[in-house]
Amino acid sequence: MEISTENWCKKPKNRSIFSKNISFQKQNKSTEEPPSSVQKLLASLQQAQNKSDLSEQPSTSKPKKNEKRKKAVAQAPASAPAPGPEEKKKQPKRASVGARMQQQAENARISQTKRPRQVSTSKGSSRNTTAPEQQNYQQQQQQYKGPRIPTDILDELEFRFISNMVECEINDNIRVCFHLELAHWYYIDHMVEDDKISGCPNVGSRDFNFQMCQHCRVLRKYAHRADEVLAKFREYKSTVPTYGAILVDPEMDHVVLVQSYFAKGKNWGFPKGKINQAEPPRDAAIRETFEETGFDFGIYSEKEKKFQRFINDGMVRLYLVKNVPKDFNFQPQTRKEIRKIEWFKIDDLPTDKTDELPAYLQGNKFYMVMPFVKDIQIYVQKEKEKLRRRKAEAVQSTPSSSIFSQLFPAQPPPPVPEDATPTRPMYKRLTSEELFSAFKNPPAGEVARPTLPDMSPAVNGLDTLAVLGICTPLKPGASLNEFSGAPQNCPMISEEAGSPADPSAEIGFAMPMDLKQPVVTSDHPWQHHKISDSSAPPQTLESHQGWLDTQLVNTIMHSPNHPLPPTSNSPATPTAVLGHLIGKPIQPQAILPQAATPTALGSAEKPKSSRISLSDNSAFKAISSTQKQSIPKATAAPPSTEKTRSASLSGSSQVVGKPARNLFNSVVSPVSSGIQSIQGDGGAWEDVWFREQLAATTTAGTSISSLAASNQELAMINREETPIEDPYFKQQAYQKAQKAQSLIPACSQWTNSIKLDIDYVVGPLSFWMQQFSTKSPVSGTGPQLP
């Protein structure tokens, strides 16, 4: 098979011409604009493809020459002449296609990472920028800010909204934007539209925020990124929960919708708004509804049905409020927030975009209403069914046969006209004067007992309320509405009506008269409080009739409450006794002086220092006498019988004709008394020490033990001749006493006379007489003892 060389020669020529055209086009484009990195990459790929196509052809001498010529023409510029053979040899070899592509990718990466230098507005960086660059930057900033707000206006806005911000809010972008939003609203409402203030341009939130950040010192750190902060704030605000209300009329046929002031077109929605920080959801709904409509549903209803939906990644919760009067004058409480407020029929509202609107609703948009319409219609239908069912049950219900139905016969409701609509009573906010006036008590003449219908059968003199147990029975012959006022000489409970001061009339039966006032002795320091007749009952205090026991309150209020002096030896007698309130009242009487009787803990004291005292911390407490004597150990003489003895309960004495108890619980320890036999006994020492601690605790503490108190009480009141035996002390005390019969009791150890052994101390007397005798020779060394 022969291959013609002419065809092979033609193909390279055509390809070379095509490649020349491509190279010329690329060179023309490069003269117009510099090639980008992408264009360079495409060109290198095209060249690599052409090279691969040529390499697939058969290798002959002529194609090789043509290929070299084609490469030289493609690489040479359009205006430059074709290089000669010598110049071709001098040209350096170019890198491979892969190396060139890697280099181009590296250059593109470096060009993308480089950012244009930003000119700083701080004072320290102004020296690094030239004057033209600074001037251009200021011109750009001036165009960015828009109309300039006066400086004094910015100062006032900073004082109102920025100066009071805490540090944590200043460092929070979102909280700063919330404060700037409030400042912008205040600027538009009170400064731009005020004729008295001139030079306040109407700027948008973007320009306003930038000027405030430039003016306020604490917000200057946000000036260079005001757009970024504002974008984050708008994104965050779209996720803040929204709360509002669905206001429905009493018939539940119509609902209130509002139109925003800046809304484009006739867009309608429910009154709602964003919740504030740390605000309860229901309070936020009440606040937003009141700001947009002037209707405060917080005083109209206590519990509402809630509807909740998520719209554009934001939660919207609405509270359905029923029985809203249709004649209420809705007025927005904020400026430039609500344009219109109207009633719409619930059944005519669309539930989807494809629903056809009635003719009178054509042109209106309900995009923010449609997600809730279907749920509202279902709820309204159920409520209407419940209302019809209740009316039917009320008509078919029969009166009950209980006793209350006989006492209170059911009366038919007044006729209601057909055209009348059920309305809920209107309430208003009370002022402080109206609120406190409601707690004032009416005069005594205006207070009356509740009236009841006639009973069947009628019984003369029967108090219906007393039979039912509602009120206290009245005094026979007293009128239902006649009450006596409270006396002026003492404070009384003014919450109930007064009544006569007759005790039998107050409680309905005669009170027992066997309760007597405690007798006060002549030496009592409160003798001026005593009445003339000591056995007369206490003076009755006037009180009024009521369900509370006011006699108890008045008795406590009028009883003298003076504390006893600590040095008083008079009997402690209560000043008032509430015997009718206690099942078995305590009636302490004055105790006459009697002979002392041994008690459970030792000998009884004299009557003057052994009285019963009703104190706050103990039911019965023995009052310690103030005539205690401090006697040194084994040095003082025995006291006389005329003086008052110590009030210690651990003393031991013997009374003529009465048995005595010798207990080893003296205040003198065995160590100080020097009793060897007691110390030597193994168990006696522990028993003596325990009894000393018990006596010291009961004497020095605020109250004595229950066992000692009960024994002391019986000893003081009964005064029996037979001593009261204590089983606790009887078991061991008598055993110790039998062992120590030959010893001197510890409690009387200090009463013995002291005798010094003179012979043991100074020696025999004969020795001293011999030493100082004139007959004996005088010794220079002095007396010497044997």
From Swiss-Prot:
Query: Which ranges are annotated Basic residues under compositional bias?
Result: 62-72
What changing R287E does, per the record, is: In var1; defective ADL, ADF, AWB and AWC sensory neuron cilia
Region entry Disordered, spans: 25-148, 556-576, 623-655
Q: What cofactors does the UniProt entry give for this protein?
A: Mg(2+); Mn(2+)
Subcellular location field: Cytoplasmic granule; Cytoplasm, Perinuclear region
Low complexity compositional bias: what residue ranges?
134-144
Q: What is its EC number?
A: 3.6.1.62
Tissue specificity: Expressed in sensory neurons.
Keyword Metal-binding, does the record have it? yes
KW Magnesium (keyword) present: yes
Reaction equations catalysed: a 5'-end (N(7)-methyl 5'-triphosphoguanosine)-ribonucleoside in mRNA + H2O = N(7)-methyl-GDP + a 5'-end phospho-ribonucleoside in mRNA + 2 H(+); a 5'-end (N(2),N(2),N(7)-trimethyl 5'-triphosphoguanosine)-ribonucleoside in mRNA + H2O = N(2),N(2),N(7)-trimethyl-GDP + a 5'-end phospho-ribonucleoside in mRNA + 2 H(+)
Question: What's this protein's function?
Answer: Decapping metalloenzyme that catalyzes the cleavage of the cap structure on mRNAs. Removes the 7-methyl guanine cap structure from mRNA molecules, yielding a 5'-phosphorylated mRNA fragment and 7m-GDP. RNA-decapping enzyme although it does not bind the RNA cap. May contribute to gene regulation in multiple RNA pathways including monomethylguanosine- and trimethylguanosine-capped RNAs. In oocytes, may play a role in the response to stress induced by heat shock, osmotic stress and anoxia. Required for the developmental axon guidance and regrowth of PLM touch receptor neurons.
Q: Subunit composition?
A: May be a component of the decapping complex composed of dcap-1 and dcap-2.
Which protein family is named in the record?
A: Belongs to the Nudix hydrolase family. DCP2 subfamily.
Q: What is this protein called?
A: m7GpppN-mRNA hydrolase dcap-2
Q: Which organism is it from?
A: Caenorhabditis elegans
